[in-house]
Amino acid sequence: MRKLKYHEKKLLTKHDFLNYKKDDNNHRDVNVIRRYHIPQREDYFKYNQLVGLLLGIANKLSLLEPTDSFGNLHKKMLLGKLFDMALLTSTPKLSDVENKLTVSAFCRRRLPVVMCRLKMCETVSTSVKYVEHGHVRVGPEVITDPAFFVTRNMEDFVTWVDSSKIRRN
């Protein structure tokens, strides 16, 4: 190997190639993206931002006094909306927002994952393909976006399109 020039040596002094820092905790996004077949990495980060905003709102509401009518009203509204979106289970509490609201909770409400849970498909990857090809409708509308968010009320209306050959089988 040739002798390094001055500016090359100067750049390499800032890096230690023998002992580099391992990023063991930064693989959560890759695992979630792979498990739920999220095609764009930006979707994961958008969900992460939403979770952060909701945690901030829940934290500010928890700091209010329990006798405050404004705080109680907004706590009920927040918990009601999260329950209707099926991000929280039955009888949610404000502590559930901090403990159970994750990016995976948002990903579990995506249309392909709901289809797998309803036994319409065996795997999430096949259900993503079916959604992209226009074989699935929610109510009267045909959905071609796999990132479609299915709420608790819309879950009953997820069916195959009438002209779909998959429905005939």
UniProtKB/Swiss-Prot annotation:
Coiled-coil regions listed in the entry: none
InterPro entries: Ribosomal_uS4, Ribosomal_uS4_N, S4_RNA-bd, S4_RNA-bd_sf
Keywords from the named record: Nucleus, Ribonucleoprotein, Ribosome biogenesis, RNA-binding, rRNA-binding
Single GO MF annotation: snoRNA binding
S4 RNA-binding domain residues: 109-166
One GO BP: rRNA processing
Pfam families in the record: Ribosomal_S4 (PF00163), S4 (PF01479)
Protein localization: Nucleus, Nucleolus
PANTHER family in the record: 30S 40S RIBOSOMAL PROTEIN, U3 SMALL NUCLEOLAR RIBONUCLEOPROTEIN PROTEIN IMP3
Protein's name according to its UniProt entry: U3 small nucleolar ribonucleoprotein protein imp3
